[in-house]
C-alpha cells in the first residue's frame, strides 16, 4: 500500500499575503469549505496573533470545518502560541504551527540570537503549544539557507519536546531540486527520531522551482507538501496545489505515495480563489488555465479525436472542467437560491445577508436569461462584506456620455446607512464614477489596477471588474459584477473601499 501524502493548504495564510489578496472572514470561510470539500488534509487558516480580524477568521473556520485539520500559525513566543491555541480551540482537529528562523543571516540580523538561544526558544515554544494540542508542527524559517548540522540539532530538540511534523521551508525559493532533495534525505537519515514525525516541505517560487523542489523532496521522503491554490503567495508565489496533486496522481509509476484529494473539485476551487482575490488565472496555467486542455494544432487535434491519450495525459473532467451548467433562472425561488449557494460553497452571514443577495440575484435574472455558477459566484464576490462591514453601498446610478461632451456620473450611495448623492465629471464614465465616489470617501487612495473580464459567453454576459486600491501601506482588491460595465466598476471600487475601511494592520510572517 502506498504512503499517504498529506496536503497542507496555506492559501488563507501565505496566499493572502500576496499584495492585494486580503480576504474578509466570509471569503475565507467560503474557501475553507471548498478546501474541505476537496478533502485537503490540513487548512492553515491564518496567523491569529496578527490582528483581531485574523483571530476571528481562524476561530470561525475552526468552528465550521469538521473533516480537515485547522491550523493556526504562531511565532515561537508565548503570546503568539496562546493566541493560536485559543483560535483553534473549537476545531474537531486543531494544529499549532510554530516557527523560528535558523539561517545564520536571520539569527544574526533579525533575531539577534545565538544558535543556542534559538534552540532553547524552539523547545519552549513546543511546550507552550502542547498545552492546547498534541498536533504541533515546527518550521525552521529559511531552512533552505541554514546549515545542515544546525538543522539536525534543532530538529532533534523539537522532536524530543513533542513536535509531530517537521517542516523544512525554502523561504526565499533559493534551492534547486537535487540540492533540496539531498537536504531532506540527509535530515531524515541523521536526525534521531526522524521516523516518528512527518517531514514537510514548503517551497516558494522565486526561481520557478516550487513544484519541482516539492516533488523532489517527496521522492526523498517528505510526506507533507505545503501549497496554495493557483500558486498564490508573496513575490512569485508558492507551490501550486493543483500541480502537485496531479503530478503525483498522474505519475503513480514514479511516486511512492498519493493524496486523498478529490481532484474534481480543483477547478471550482481555483475559480473561487481567483474570484475572491481578483487574481486571474493565466490561460496557459497548468491544470486550471483556460487553455490547459485546448489543442490548436491540427496534428494535435487529429490525434486527440482519434485517441485522446495521444496528446492528453489526464482528462479535463477529472480536475473539474466541464462541470458547469445552467442552475437557476428568473422563476427560481429563495430556497433554490440558498441551496445552490451551499452547493458551490458559499455561506451567507445571516438571513438579512441572504435576502440582500437574493434581491441582487432576481435583478440579474431579469437582465440575463441563463444564469451559471460563475454568475452566482461573481454576484456574491461583492456581497461577501457582511452588512456591519458595508460602509459604502451603491443605491442608484446614472451616467451621461455623449460625443463631444464631458462624461458625468450621478450616484446615490449609502454611507453607514445614510443615503448621499454625489456627482463628478471625468475623462470617461468609469473615471467619472470613481471621482464621484472619491468625493464622498475622500482622496488619498491610489488605483493600482483596473481590469474587466466577461464571466460567461453571450451579449448578455456579466462583466466582472477588479480594482486594486492602495492607501498608505494597505493594498486590497475589490470585485464587482453587472451586465453594465460602468455599474460593475462602481461596485468594485466600493467593494475595495469597504475592505480598506475594515482591514486591520496585520503581521506577515515569512516561511
Curated annotation (Swiss-Prot):
Q: What is this protein called?
A: 2-isopropylmalate synthase
**Chain residue ranges for the region called Regulatory domain:** 393-511
Give the pathway annotation. Amino-acid biosynthesis; L-leucine biosynthesis; L-leucine from 3-methyl-2-oxobutanoate: step 1/4
Pfam hit, one = LeuA_dimer
- Gene symbol of the encoding locus: leuA
Which GO annotations describe the biological process of this protein? Answer: L-leucine biosynthetic process
Q: List the disulfide bonds.
A: none
Which PROSITE patterns does the UniProt record give?
Answer: AIPM_HOMOCIT_SYNTH_1 (PS00815), AIPM_HOMOCIT_SYNTH_2 (PS00816), PYR_CT (PS50991)
Please tell me where this protein is predominantly located: cytoplasm
- Please report which protein family the annotation says this sequence is part of: Belongs to the alpha-IPM synthase/homocitrate synthase family. LeuA type 1 subfamily.
Q: Which SUPFAM superfamilies match?
A: 2-isopropylmalate synthase LeuA, allosteric (dimerisation) domain, Aldolase
Q: Which GO terms describe its cellular component?
A: cytosol
Q: Which UniProt keywords apply?
A: Amino-acid biosynthesis, Branched-chain amino acid biosynthesis, Cytoplasm, Leucine biosynthesis, Manganese, Metal-binding, Transferase
Q: Does the keyword Metal-binding apply?
A: yes
**Self-association state and partner proteins as the record states:** Homodimer.
Q: Which reaction does it catalyse?
A: 3-methyl-2-oxobutanoate + acetyl-CoA + H2O = (2S)-2-isopropylmalate + CoA + H(+)
Q: Does the record carry Nucleotide-binding as a key word?
A: no
The protein's role, per its UniProt record: Catalyzes the condensation of the acetyl group of acetyl-CoA with 3-methyl-2-oxobutanoate (2-ketoisovalerate) to form 3-carboxy-3-hydroxy-4-methylpentanoate (2-isopropylmalate).
Which PANTHER family does the UniProt record give? 2-ISOPROPYLMALATE SYNTHASE 1, CHLOROPLASTIC-RELATED, HOMOCITRATE SYNTHASE-RELATED
- Tell me the compartments it is located in: Cytoplasm
- GO MF annotations, alphabetized: 2-isopropylmalate synthase activity; acetyl-CoA C-acetyltransferase activity; manganese ion binding
Enzyme nomenclature, EC number: 2.3.3.13
Q: Where does Mn(2+) bind?
A: 14, 202, 204, 238
Cofactor list:
Mn(2+)
Pyruvate carboxyltransferase domain residues? 5-267
